Amino acid sequence: MASLREIRKRLQSIQNIQQLTKAMEMVAASRLHQVQIKVKQAKPYVVKLSEILDRLSQITQDIKHPLLEQREVKKVGVVIVAADMGLSGPYNKDIFSAANKFLKTYAQEQVELILVGKKATDYYKKRPWNIRFEFGEWGEKLTSHQIKTFANQLMSWFLIGELDEIWLVYTHYVTMMTRKVMVEKFLNIQQISPKSEKSPVDYIFEPNPKQIYGAILFNYCMTKFQSILNESYASELAARIFAMKAATSNADDMIEKLTLVRNKVRQAGITKEMLEITSGAEGLK
């Protein structure tokens, strides 16, 4: 059995770790609250843009735009959105599992990866995939300007023909308890069907619909991409909260068990000393 000093040292170590996991849980909860607001605010905007684009498509059925172009697929870009750090349970593992399953549907030479998050870079640099672009340290550090630049770059690669399709692998945030890894096509843009059962609004477009279609389409892509990044970050934080909560709970169990062992060892030591004193006293008689 370990000595009393060793048990106390281990107990102190676990208590220190528990303080750290509690702090990380609180920080993640605070950040999640801020990101949840962004996710909630973006959804109505994306839906409304979808409705406008859908209405434009209906009244100008012959409309054409480069972002809608469907062409022979020679090069595919796959954006994989993971975390910058671990300590978030199976969050990163689930993303890589879904991404790898999707990547198997293409020949290796067809695919170029666009990696978001240090964990994605660390994972795929060890594997035989072509990496076009890496973006680390994102999360709360990512500004609106950087997101706009990133989305513009994706659209540029598609428009100049360097990539014929662009797919996104990310985590869709539903609730604190519910998250789902999604594999979703970003470009070319498919027919947009807003999830609304309301009667279509009869918009008055000024200037004419064809002139404003492209601008709204670009705005839609920007907003959609920003929304996806926010959802991924919210999912990461939610996963980290649960992981840290579980770690804190496990630390409680270990502290309880070690405290019991410490008390037993201390009691055994006291009993041993008492026996030695009693034996010594008997020997002096």
UniProtKB/Swiss-Prot annotation:
One GO location term (cellular component)? proton-transporting ATP synthase complex
Q: Which domain of life is it from?
A: Bacteria
What GO MF terms are annotated? ATP binding; proton-transporting ATP synthase activity, rotational mechanism
| Primary localisation category | membrane
Keywords assigned by UniProt, alphabetized = ATP synthesis, Cell inner membrane, Cell membrane, CF(1), Hydrogen ion transport, Ion transport, Membrane, Transport
- Transmembrane portions of the chain: none
The UniProt entry lists membrane topology as: Peripheral membrane protein
Q: Where does the record say this protein resides?
A: Cell inner membrane
The text of the family note is:
Belongs to the ATPase gamma chain family.
| Oligomer and partners | F-type ATPases have 2 components, CF(1) - the catalytic core - and CF(0) - the membrane proton channel. CF(1) has five subunits: alpha(3), beta(3), gamma(1), delta(1), epsilon(1). CF(0) has three main subunits: a, b and c.
The protein, known as: ATP synthase gamma chain
Organism of derivation: Protochlamydia amoebophila (strain UWE25)
Question: What would be the name of the gene that encodes this protein?
Answer: atpG
